[in-house]
């Protein structure tokens, strides 16, 4: 009799390093270097002639879907979008090459963040084989050259743990807060309006939006309204008014995305009620966010 073993070894992960998380010098260094990895300009105005903002959103949505389907680490998608924005800020690109560029950026980001990175062949399949593996590998060298091999970019995810550990949060809610903040960060990466924002501001605004959405301010005044905003602003040395504006913009993006999802679902299933659609189809990590 043959035995079929269906057990899967869990992904081995390093334990949190207190020498990194509890040393304020690490946070200070991240804040010092984060702007080095921002796009040099608002490239739709002065660099790109063939590519429009809606095209970036389309390729970003496709990249996010690929990363989710492949169960990539949370950091892969925002890092790939950082590469894409920095490349587009210096190289005029034809719209027919935009998906190829997105695939290359995911290829590079997964090499940096994944234990088992995405393969060129698999990424080509996700483009319906509109590009070839050799073409992707050739573009990989082009992108590396234009980015000057500076791939270890600072992203909002680098700040999440530093922010969470300084807040008086209930331990049983940390996983949920972290998941919601990661969802907000991914949404921000799909929207070009956030491309020029420092990663620390996006991270701080995402954590603030997550805490407000989960309504964790019932028993602790430091987690409510302006008190929370002031506290978060001090952690990352962010201007309070800028942080408020960023958080409001993040919440607005979420509301807009939820509305768009519902409209698409109603068009495809006109006989179902909104409540039925919410229960059946809306992604869990988005539905659980309460504004």
Curated annotation (Swiss-Prot):
Question: Posttranslational modification, per the record?
Answer: Phosphorylation at Thr-282 by MAP kinases is required for ubiquitination and degradation by the DCX(AMBRA1) complex.
Q: Name one GO biological process term.
A: cell division
Please indicate if the UniProt record lists Nuclease as a keyword.
Answer: no
> Which compartments does it reside in?
Nucleus; Cytoplasm; Nucleus membrane
Annotated region Disordered: the residues are: 264-291
Q: Name one GO molecular function term.
A: cyclin-dependent protein serine/threonine kinase regulator activity
Residues with the Phosphothreonine modification: 282
Keyword line: Cell cycle, Cell division, Cyclin, Cytoplasm, Membrane, Nucleus, Phosphoprotein, Ubl conjugation
One cellular component term from this protein's GO annotations in UniProt: nuclear membrane
Q: Family assignment?
A: Belongs to the cyclin family. Cyclin D subfamily.
- PANTHER family (UniProt xref): CYCLINS
Q: How does it assemble?
A: Interacts with the CDK4 and CDK6 protein kinases to form a serine/threonine kinase holoenzyme complex. The cyclin subunit imparts substrate specificity to the complex.
Summarizing the function annotation, the protein's role is: Regulatory component of the cyclin D2-CDK4 (DC) complex that phosphorylates and inhibits members of the retinoblastoma (RB) protein family including RB1 and regulates the cell-cycle during G(1)/S transition. Phosphorylation of RB1 allows dissociation of the transcription factor E2F from the RB/E2F complex and the subsequent transcription of E2F target genes which are responsible for the progression through the G(1) phase. Hypophosphorylates RB1 in early G(1) phase. Cyclin D-CDK4 complexes are major integrators of various mitogenenic and antimitogenic signals.
User: What is this protein identified as?
Assistant: G1/S-specific cyclin-D2
The major lineage groups are: Eukaryota, Metazoa, Chordata, Craniata, Vertebrata
**Gene that specifies this protein:** CCND2
């Amino acid at each position: 009799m043959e035995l079929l073993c269906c057990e899967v070894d869990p992904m081995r992960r390093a334990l949190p390093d207190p020498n990194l998380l509890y040393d304020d010098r690490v946070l200070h260094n991240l804040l010092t270097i984060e702007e080095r990895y921002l796009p040099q300009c608002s490239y739709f105005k002065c660099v790109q002639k063939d590519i429009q903002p809606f095209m970036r959103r389309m390729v970003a949505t496709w990249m996010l879907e690929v990363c989710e389907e492949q169960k990539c680490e949370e950091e892969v998608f925002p890092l790939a979008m950082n590469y894409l924005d920095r490349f587009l800020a210096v190289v005029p690109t034809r719209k027919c090459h935009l998906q190829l560029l997105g695939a290359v950026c995911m290829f590079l980001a997964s090499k940096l963040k994944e234990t088992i990175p995405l393969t060129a062949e698999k990424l080509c399949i996700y483009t319906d084989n509109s590009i070839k593996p050799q073409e992707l590998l050739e573009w990989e060298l082009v992108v590396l050259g234009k980015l000057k091999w500076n791939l270890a970019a600072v992203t909002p995810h680098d700040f999440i743990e530093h922010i969470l550990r300084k807040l008086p949060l209930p331990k049983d809610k940390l996983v949920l807060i972290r998941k919601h903040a990661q969802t907000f960060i991914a949404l921000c990466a799909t929207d070009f309006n956030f491309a020029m924002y420092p990663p620390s501001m996006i991270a701080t605004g995402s954590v603030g939006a997550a805490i407000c959405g989960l309504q964790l301010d019932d028993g602790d005044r430091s987690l409510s309204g302006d008190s929370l905003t002031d506290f978060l602003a001090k952690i990352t040395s962010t201007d309070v008014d800028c942080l408020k504006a960023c958080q409001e913009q993040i919440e607005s993006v979420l509301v807009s995305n939820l509305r768009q999802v519902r409209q698409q679902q109603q068009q495809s299933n006109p006989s179902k009620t909104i409540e039925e659609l919410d229960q059946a189809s809306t992604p869990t990590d988005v539905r659980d966010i309460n504004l």
